[in-house]
Structures are given as structure tokens and as C-alpha cells.
Amino acid sequence: MIIPEAPPPPPPPDPTPTPSNPGVPAPLPGVYTDKGEAPRDEHFRGLIALPIRDMDGLESTLRSLYDPASPRFRKYLSTDEIKERHAPTEADVKVVTDWLVSQKLKVDAVAANRLLIYFEGTVGQFNDAFHVKLRYLSRKPPQEGNQPHLVFGLLEAITVPKFVEERIQALVSLDIDEPVEPIQPADNRDVGPPKEIEKGYTPKQISDAYGVSKLHAMGFKGKGVKLGVLIGGTYHHHDVMDFWQVFGVARKDARVVEPLGPPLLRIRESNLDVQWAGAIAPEADLVVYAAPDARNTSMIYSFNEMIGRGEVTVMTDSFAHREDSEPRAVRYFYMYSSMFAAAQGITVLAASGDSAGVDVPASSPYVTAVGGTLVGVKDGRAVWEIAWEESGSGTSLNLAAPEWQKGLPGIDSKRGTPDVALNAGMGYWYLWLGGWYSNIGTSFASPVMAGLVAVVNNARESQGKPPMGWLNPLLYTRKDVQATFRDITEGGTPKYKAQKGWDMPTGWGAPDAEGLYRTMP
């Protein structure tokens, strides 16, 4: 008997200092202004991303999952299958977390799909570990009226040992702590309908405009579908329940998941997202993933965690940020995370933004970007619809145009947005701390589209069909699916005009829920 030789021992970890890609902003004229070094005792929290394993294999799987001619069509991967095939290994995660701990940093969480590590410490500990000096930058928001706020920034690349650099994708985010605001209860007794109801749209009017009411009438209201809503902070429970009650939406309360602990503040945006997603799909199981605040670290982790846990089949994110003001690592991480969603059969929808530019996470080709229109609704139907001048639109700075977008107007080598569009320029009603407000934005359009998808998935399930999952490949390649969209040919942004067929301000146009149900294979 020949005894095989033992394999040689692995080489020792290479400690050579190696530059790595930071997802932390640098000074940028008109966006980020340097305010000097951050004090060493300041607290930070951040995210490190690890790379997808076998990217070529994942891309091949995605092509087959969304090819009607493939025997693998819509045979989505489970969370366990995608981790086994494509998630970073537990061993690699341990190498990185052990190194962080050795640098006196605290590791608080590892994402369910192992794509992210959440860690914290002081600025001094970070500077020593990564051989940099963190700075304060003042960030100017692109929307008028929003006040600048402080963020961390860098003037140089981080440096880590080579054995760490080989195992990470990027430092994706680094954030200052959000000031804790007291979450006061609101007195919502005797809340009735808005006094001047004609100044905003109701859930019934929007459902009529986009064909959702037709599916409601057929008995499909989202039953059995888990609809995910990503929010920053928390929403006001009584506002949400009263909104639904006033507008005749009979539904159960949302279930709230807090991936990083309890909320630090209440955010108006979160109220409207939950109210409208739940109203359009009244029988869907609403699952709200509540980040502690709306900073990148909290939102990116919670976005990915909703995907990693794999319990929803459609999700919406209205917390959009201009792509040109986000570091490259942020843009790419949203793409990698949403690739996992596509493989799992999760439809990811995101507001395309309200500043006529390109936003993240909508710039990811694995996300369906929801742009904006202005719609007129009368007698239970849309009577006119044009492109909204602030509809987030354009081509990505970095992310490549997928094959199914090449050759479209304005598309050269980069991904174009949006993919679809719904009302964003005419007011929607929402309830905030017991008071009625009518407001605009793609922040409404994305949860409405998510509710629409949930209702369509409910109808598909009744026919034995799986959820639609990643919408984009079939939306861009199926003429019968495109034909169900209301083509928007008038209006536009300062840069792009609506035209026949796909265009930058509105994508393929406005969806019709019944048409999508009838045509999507």
C-alpha cells in the first residue's frame, strides 16, 4: 500500500501592504467640500464587501434563468444554492474579520449571503488599520432645498495586508453616526379624508391608471406574495394604518425586520413608501426592512440583507442617490447584490431619482429603474401621460450596457435608465404624523410599481407560474411585453425628450398590470 504524501502546507499570509479600492468619497467640486481631518475619537461604522465567487458561472446561470428557450427558465436558485455556488467562503470571511479584530475594530454583523461585513470603531483605529487620515467632507445634495451634511472622506487609497486585499472587493461605505432623534407619537384620532382631495391622487386612481384595478376585480390583490419595502429609520404605524383605512384598503399590518437594530429616527419618506406599496397590493404580505437611518452603511447593508435572506419576491427602494456623487465601489456593490436577487427570482425596483440624472441603485442593470411621468386620470383610466421633467435618467458612469440595451437611442457602452415610468409629477396623498400632504417624486412611483408586480405575481401563481423575478431581459427582448406598456411620446427632461419606443426619460413607458400578466412568459 502506497501512502500518499501529505499536501504541502499553505503559504503563510502575505502581510505586504497593498492599496485597495475605497468606497469613501473624495473632495469633488460642487458636491464634496473638504472640511479638514476628523478627530481620532470620532466613532464610525462601515462596510467591507467581498467578491462574488465564480462570476462567469453566475452570469451564465442568469442568462439561462431568463431565457424562455432554456430548460432552466425561471428555475431560480435558493438562498442555500446561491451561497454554496457564488457567495464568499466562510473561510475567507473569517480571515477578513479576524484581521479587523486584530486591528482593535469591532465586527458587528456578516450579511446572510456573506457579501458584506459590518464593522465599527474610532477614526483613530481606522486610520491606524488602513494607513490613512479620515477627513470631514460637506456633502451638497443635488435636490434644491436639502441642506448639506457631513460625511467621512479620504484623500488617498486605503492600504491593507495583501492577504486581506486578495479577499475583499472594496471598502464600500464609512459613515458618521446619525444623531438620534426622539421618535414622538402622533395623535391620529379622527383622521378623515384630505379636505381638498382633488389636489392629490388616491390609491384607487393610481390603480386605475396602471391596470391594477383590473386584476383586483379578478380577485388578484397580492395574496401569498411577500412584498419587501426598504426604508431608512422607521415609519409611523398609526399613519400607515389610518392611510389604508381612509382609502378603503383592507389589509393587515406590515412585518418589520431591523437588520442592524432599532431605528434612530423617523423619516417621512419611509411613511409614504409603506403606505403606497401596501395600498396597491392590499393582500400581499408586507415585509419592511428598516435600516437604523438613511446613511449609506445602513441602507446598503439592509438592501443586501433583504436579498440575502431571500424571503421576498419583489422589493422596492426609494432612497436614491445621484450616481455621480457616490463612490465607484457603491455603484458596483449595488450591481453585485442585485445579481444575487435576480438569481433568486427577486424583482428589485428602485426610484430612478428626481433630479433628471442617474441614481443608484437604479443604475444597476439587475434593478428595474422606475422613472417619472405626469398622468391625468379620469373616469377610472389614464387619459393622458407625458414625461416628467425631473425623471431620473441618463447613462451610468461605470456600469456597462447589457446586451439587451445595446442599439437603443442614446445607449453607447453604458447602462441607460430608466426602464419603466409611472406618475411622479402629479401629487400623491400620504399621511405624516396625522396630517395630509400631497407630494411628488419617483419615491412614490417605485413602491407603486412594486405593488403592481406583487399583484401580477399573485395572478401568475394562480396559473402555476413562478414570480417574474428580474424584469429587464424579457422587457427589452419581448415585443409582446413591450406592447402592453403605454408609450410616452411627449414631455421630457432638460437633457432627454420622450419619443416613440424606448427613451431616456421614461424607458418603455407606463406599465399595464393586466397586460404584463397576459404577456410575460
Regions found by a protein language model. Give the residues of each.
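Short acidic, Gly/Pro-enriched loop/turn segments at secondary-structure junctions
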Residues: 376-383
